Amino acid sequence: IRDFNKENFELRKSRLEKMVKDLNLDHNETVAEISIKDQYYNMKEMIDPQYYIVELAREAMLSCNIGPVVVPVRGGTDGSRLSYMGLPCPNIFGGGHNFHGEYEYIPTKSMESACRVIVAIISKVYLNSSQNG
C-alpha cells in the first residue's frame, strides 16, 4: 500500500483490516488473516526540509541541457527507505522503461545523461565547499 498522504495511507490499511474482519464475521470463522508491515513511506516529508538537494539536481540537469521534470513518487524505492534512515535521497533520474517487467531496459543515452548529471552535482558541491572554506 502506498500513498502520497500519510492519513490516506493509514486509512487504506484500516480498510483492509476491516475487510478481513468483516469477511471473518460473514463466515462466522477465521477464513482470512492480515498482517501489515510498513516498508516504504512517502519521502516528501524527509526531502522537504532538505529541498536544496532537489534544487541542486535541477541546476545540474539544466547545466547538462536536460529539462528537469519533477514528479512525485509514492515510495517503493531505495531512496524512500534511505530517506527515512536519515539520508535524504530524492529520485532525480530514471530513464528506464517497462519497470519490473520482462522487457525492462534503460537506453545507453539515458545512462550517459545520468552520469553527466551526477558529475555536475559533484562539481557543484565541490565548488560550493571550496568557496565556503
State each model region's role.
Residues 1-133:
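Metal-dependent amide/peptide-bond hydrolase catalytic core
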